[in-house]
């Protein structure tokens, strides 16, 4: 039986029996040809030359003056309690006893998740002489609320403290040779008819709002401090290039733009490796993907363990209305194990009573290990330059606290 076979480089191979030919036209199927990307450039530079040009153009490329940044900040945490044991418990407060503590530990969740989202205007300057400022627009949070049993135990402990501990007492906490002062709040009831009591409550509320705002500034500052051109950045691939090896530069596509792609790995004690994406026209780093390849921090001493084993993420820099690049997006993942295995004493003292100042004492040994993972994300919707005078006139005053939600189901920044 005779066959006729047709084969060509962009045609699907086809075969026919000669006896089946009954037409002068033979239909063949074309096969798509996959071609690799081809980049043509007149800049044949080594990675060392590219890095050198990045350094040379830092001041020209990146915004270091006063800016107003319209931001969305998200921070999600997962905490797993690997071990939590309290023994050798002694207490001079009758209601605070070992059985109550055992009930408390038995009802504590082994895993807790939380989330906090904030929309704000964040004001900054590269110069550390000027404190960063924030105007919070709104904020929301979610976390595991206590169960009924745990809430009941906490209420019982709170009542016992209010009954036995005096509002004008001061407190010391000791762990072996270590010691310090301890503030215990909430022992005073707020009397709505007492002007002084109300004033203290209002001052406390203002402080909480101020502390929340400062906490958000601290989180955002930490992200900006990772920018590769910041003085104390841990991502010092560019400021200290002698500490790193750089791969041969590849041409790649990022979004719709051509970029140089360079891999960076540490030579010695440096802890981070990274992928750098560099604009070939102005030699600006427009994206960094980084990851730690060694523990960021690890200590085990005198019953205290801290092991920061994870820090990775990415940072994207973009041009907004001006001609310079600013941070437009960042995500940093963080993981650490913390352990504490030491004796603790909580001592109540009061100088307004006759006799000895020591009133009550609670002592125990705590053995605790937790694993905490957090993911912090910032999206900058807009960034614009402002004058030093405008920056100085901005008041650091916050009236916003996060609203609680059982879960986040909506797009928080849609109307922003």
PLM region spans:
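Short, surface-exposed beta-strand/turn modules with glycine/proline-rich turns
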Residues: 238-243
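Surface-exposed, low-complexity/disordered segments
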Residues: 14, 23-231, 237, 255, ...
């Amino acid at each position: 039986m005779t066959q006729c076979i047709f084969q060509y480089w962009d045609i699907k191979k086809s075969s026919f029996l000669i006896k089946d030919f009954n037409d002068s036209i033979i239909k063949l199927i074309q096969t798509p040809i996959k071609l690799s990307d081809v980049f043509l450039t007149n800049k044949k530079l080594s990675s060392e030359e590219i890095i050198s040009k990045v350094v040379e153009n830092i001041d020209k490329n990146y915004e270091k003056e006063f800016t107003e940044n319209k931001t969305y900040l998200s921070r999600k945490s997962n905490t797993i309690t690997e071990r939590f044991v309290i023994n050798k418990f002694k207490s001079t407060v009758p209601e605070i006893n070992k059985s109550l503590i055992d009930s408390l530990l038995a009802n504590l969740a082994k895993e807790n998740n939380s989330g906090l989202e904030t929309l704000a205007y964040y004001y900054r300057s590269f110069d550390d002489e000027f404190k960063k400022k924030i105007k919070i627009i709104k904020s929301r949070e979610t976390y595991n609320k206590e169960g009924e049993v745990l809430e009941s135990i906490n209420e019982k402990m709170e009542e016992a403290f209010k009954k036995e501990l005096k509002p004008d007492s001061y407190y010391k906490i000791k762990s072996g040779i270590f010691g310090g002062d301890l503030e215990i709040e909430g022992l005073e009831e707020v009397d709505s008819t007492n002007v002084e009591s109300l004033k203290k409550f209002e001052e406390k509320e203002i402080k909480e709002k101020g502390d929340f705002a400062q906490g958000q500034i601290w989180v955002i500052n930490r992200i900006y401090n990772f920018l590769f051109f910041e003085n104390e950045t841990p991502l010092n691939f560019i400021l200290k290039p002698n500490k790193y090896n750089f791969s041969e530069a590849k041409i790649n596509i990022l979004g719709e733009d051509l970029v140089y792609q360079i891999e960076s790995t540490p030579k010695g004690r440096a802890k981070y490796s990274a992928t750098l994406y560099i604009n070939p026209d102005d030699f600006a780093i427009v994206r960094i993907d980084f990851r730690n390849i060694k523990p960021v921090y690890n200590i085990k001493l005198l019953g205290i363990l801290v092991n920061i084993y994870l820090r990775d993420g990415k940072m994207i820099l973009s041009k907004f209305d001006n001609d310079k690049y600013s941070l437009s997006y960042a995500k940093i993942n963080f993981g650490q194990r913390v352990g504490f295995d030491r004796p603790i004493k909580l001592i109540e003292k009061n100088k307004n009573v006759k006799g000895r100042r020591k009133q009550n004492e609670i002592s125990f040994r705590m053995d605790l290990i937790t694993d905490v993972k957090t993911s912090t994300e910032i999206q900058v919707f807009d960034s614009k330059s402002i004058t030093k005078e405008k920056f100085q006139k901005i008041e650091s005053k916050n009236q916003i606290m996060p609203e609680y939600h059982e879960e986040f189901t909506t797009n928080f920044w849609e109307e922003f």
